[in-house]
């Protein structure tokens, strides 16, 4: 009986005798690059960041409007009832009513050009440019982080898919063993104890498969949420080794130089500084050039006629026309301490931005170091996991041979088979963890999108090359 079971066992698990490796799929496949590009095009998080950046660009235009003159036109027509000293005087002298009712008409146009406002316009433009640049780099940072999320989901799905394959093959081998043992037991040639043992192991194999299928289902949902498509025909990606840092020091230097989150935080500091400079403009006078013209009729109860019948001419018309060109200076001498308070507020905002930048710096150093350490330790771990797989294969094969000779029990063979399954699963998990660690390192240094050769949308470059922004 043991000889037959051992022979069946060797046949049933022959497909599992190879070491677990990452095997790319064939045919039409959805690459990691395609998945990331799709996510960047459709994910709401990126759309939020993009629209925030575009809104900041409009703030630049609002600030730049301070360099240009304002032109206003006004017109009006309506009935006016007037009782004034002049109407009462006419009433007393000539016996007319004290109230005058006329149709009043007004037309006017005015132009104002700010000549000097304490450099407020210049500083506001600078502030808005730095804020737009900060939002632009925040957009790129969001894209980097989303690319890492998609990469992780992509690899997690592939890993879950391959673990399901392992679990299915493990169940298949246990099912064959169970069928052989049950057949022998039913014919009276086998032991009920052997049947109980293999039944328990078969149940665990079923449980392992269900757990693997559950993990695969979860991985599919995570992927669909990020990419908005169903994962199909995926292939194992290969990180760009040339872009990976060769040391932790190099990785940290790359992160400090290239990470978009740090660049965004630096621009926030510059924007806060420009805001403080803009508040100082309140200490200076404002000089404007005003040009205006007005054409009015029947103002203030005066229609150009006289109540004195002896005046000549009796009607000179009620129109009043005026053209004015004047340079004005306005200097606020006291504002209740508001100007000083605004300056202090801006100073605190600078300190806040610096603290945010320092926090971002620490986070990036932490993330880079963790990614580097994960890669280093996984490289060390994998050689032992590989040895574990190889040793488990040898042990399983030896136990099968010994089982046929009656030197090993069925439980020994089942234990060796289960250990091989666990060893392969651990090695497979470590291989994918190593891949994820490499992509984490590319993300931590701000190089992930570039390493994936993702084409950045043209609109992300902005309408101009702003101070501190992404230069196109």
Located regions from the model:
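Bacterial Sec-pathway N-terminal export signals of envelope proteins
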Residues: 27-76, 82, 114-115, 231-270, ...
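Small/polar, glycine/serine/threonine/aspartate-rich low-complexity segments that form flexible
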Residues: 74-113, 237-244, 277, 290-331, ...
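A glycine-/polar-enriched beta->alpha junction
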Residues: 37-47, 54-70, 101, 109-126, ...
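Periplasmic alpha-helical coiled-coil/stalk elements that build and connect Gram-negative outer-membrane
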Residues: 2-7, 145-258, 374, 378, ...
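Amphipathic alpha-helical coiled-coil segments
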Residues: 48-63, 142, 146-165, 176, ...
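Short, charged, amphipathic alpha-helical segments
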Residues: 126-129, 192-203, 344, 410-418
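Acidic, low-complexity, intrinsically disordered peripheral segments
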Residues: 3-7, 81, 426-472
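Bacterial N-terminal signal peptides
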Residues: 14-24
């Amino acid at each position: 009986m043991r000889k037959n079971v051992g022979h069946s066992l060797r046949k049933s698990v022959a497909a599992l005798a190879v070491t677990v490796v990452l095997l790319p799929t064939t045919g039409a496949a959805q690459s990691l690059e395609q998945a990331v590009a799709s996510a960047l095009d459709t994910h709401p998080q990126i759309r939020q960041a993009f629209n925030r950046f575009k809104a900041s660009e409009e703030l630049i235009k609002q600030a730049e409007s301070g360099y240009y003159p304002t032109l206003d036109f006004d017109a009006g027509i309506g009935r006016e009832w007037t009782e004034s000293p002049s109407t009462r005087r006419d009433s007393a002298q000539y016996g007319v009513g004290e109230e005058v009712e006329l149709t009043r008409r007004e037309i006017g146009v005015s132009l104002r050009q700010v000549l000097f406002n304490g450099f407020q316009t210049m500083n506001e433009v600078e502030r808005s440019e730095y804020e737009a640049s900060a939002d632009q780099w925040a957009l790129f940072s969001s894209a980097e982080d989303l690319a890492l999320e998609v990469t992780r989901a992509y690899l997690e799905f592939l890993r879950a898919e391959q673990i399901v394959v392992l679990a299915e093959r493990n169940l298949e081998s246990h099912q064959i063993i169970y069928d052989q043992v049950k057949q022998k037991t039913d014919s009276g040639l086998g032991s009920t104890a052997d049947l109980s043992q293999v039944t328990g192991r078969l149940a665990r194999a079923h449980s392992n498969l269900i757990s693997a299928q559950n993990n695969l289902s979860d991985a599919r949902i995570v992927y669909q949420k990020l990419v908005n498509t169903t994962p199909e025909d995926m292939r194992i990606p290969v990180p760009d080794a040339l872009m990976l840092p060769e040391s932790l020091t190099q990785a940290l230097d790359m992160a400090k130089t290239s990470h978009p989150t740090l660049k965004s935080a630096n621009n926030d500091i510059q924007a806060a500084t420009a805001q403080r400079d803009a508040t100082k403009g309140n200490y200076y006078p404002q000089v404007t050039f005003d040009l205006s013209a007005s054409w009015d009729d029947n103002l203030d109860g005066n229609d150009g006629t006289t109540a004195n019948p002896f005046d000549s001419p009796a009607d000179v018309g009620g129109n009043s026309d005026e053209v004015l060109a004047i340079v004005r200076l306005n200097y606020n001498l006291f504002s209740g301490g508001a100007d000083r308070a605004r300056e202090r507020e801006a100073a605190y905002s600078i300190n806040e931005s610096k603290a945010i930048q320092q926090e971002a710096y620490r986070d990036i150093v932490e993330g880079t170091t963790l990614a580097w350490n994960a890669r280093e330790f996984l490289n060390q771990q994998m050689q032992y996991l590989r040895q574990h797989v190889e040793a488990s294969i040898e042990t399983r094969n030896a136990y099968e041979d010994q089982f046929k000779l009656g030197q090993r029990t069925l439980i020994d063979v089942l234990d060796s088979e289960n250990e091989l399954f666990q060893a392969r699963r651990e090695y497979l998990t470590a291989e994918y963890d190593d891949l994820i660690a490499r992509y984490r390192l590319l993300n931590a240094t701000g190089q992930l999108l570039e390493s994936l050769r993702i084409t950045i949308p043209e609109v992300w470059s902005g309408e101009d090359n702003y101070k501190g922004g992404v230069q196109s």
